[in-house]
Amino acid sequence: MSQCGLYCRSLSQEHEIRIALPTIIAKDVGMKTIDLITLRRDFHRAPELGFAENLTKARIAAILTELGLEVFEGVGVVGLLKQGSGNRAIGLRADMDALPIFETSTHDYVSQNPGTMHACGHDGHMTMLLGAAAILAKDPDFDGTVVFLFQPNEEHGLGAQAMLDEGILERFPIQEVYAIHNLPGAPLGQVSTRTGQICSSESLFEIIIEGQGGHASMPQMGRDAITIGAEIVQALQTIVSRKLAPGAGVVVSVTEFITNGQRNVLPGQATLKGDVRARMPQDREAVAKLMKQISEGIAAAHGVSISVAFNTEFIETINASGPTEAVVEAAGAQGLETIPNREPMSFSEDFAHFCQAVPGCLLLIGNGQEGPYGQPLHASNYDFNDALLPIGAAFWAQLVRDRLAKPAGEQGDNV
């Protein structure tokens, strides 16, 4: 496949580097509307937390308007690009929010909001989607409607549902929906996805033990909430090891053990908090049931009262077969390395709510393996790889042109 070049500045060098792209967007690369690297770094300098992405939303809306899209602002930002007479529509989603993390990077575009950081690559996700909007606005070689969905508050699992509750899909009906998430440690531009469950659910639990406090020198006079809590912590681990099938992909983690005890005072109360990840809804429901049974059984044995709360923050993300096949085909057309049946991920994504409403696909794309690009998501020294920006934008454009292809005889010349 012949290639053309899109130039962008290197992170580590003063000279320019060439990013190879397929000829399908050869006519697009002369576009000067958006400097993707500058835009991404601007987003990185000005991170905003979930449901407070006000400056971010304003910047996105202004860019989409400048590109000639119809723009609608609400919980998030929606850009509408129509071409031809086709009645098909697809949605492309990017998340906007940052994390409450102090950045420890030393590059010249570190967060200017201390304690807030784009540590999950949402700055890059937004920029890739805006790049795709620029490509498609300049050369709308498709037939139908593209709905660009810029979503708030992914990190708390609330933004997607908020957009749905606002009636976004009733106002802008789509037949399919797609999202990209970068994957640190994977080779740059490597696309991986799968049909079926790709991201786990996340549930939070809180167990409150009401014992009887007493003097540390006379434990027999009380009901030690710490000892009871420790027994529960150990017993909860048997859910994964003895109650569920091997390979179920369930994780049960106690992350907090809180008491009201003092140096010489046995606590009368203890609180256990933690996190559960599950690949399948039935496993998530089984964990909730078993957690309650185990905790209440141990409490009864010790003669104390107990309460168990179990709340699901993120549901499982389930990719539909048709959109997943489309992603694999588009990635292949772009010459990208593709893993079409990757292992499910243990992290969670509220894009799941979009996939529950319409057939969709979440794909992962490699962020690179060196330096800050290989650091884990949510690490204070993580960074999105700018070399991925044109790759992601070109992929989005390819997917749109594939899924909203013009009727035979109306195809444009993309060479």
Name every feature range the model reports, one short phrase each.
Residues 43, 92, 122, 148, ...:
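Divalent metal-coordination and catalytic microenvironments
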Residues 77-80, 99-101, 106-117, 123-124, ...:
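Histidine/acidic-residue-rich, glycine-tolerant segments that coordinate divalent metal ions
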Residues 230-415:
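Metal-dependent amide/peptide-bond hydrolase catalytic core
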Residues 91-93, 102, 205, 362-368:
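Non-cysteine beta-strand/loop elements that form the S-adenosyl-L-methionine
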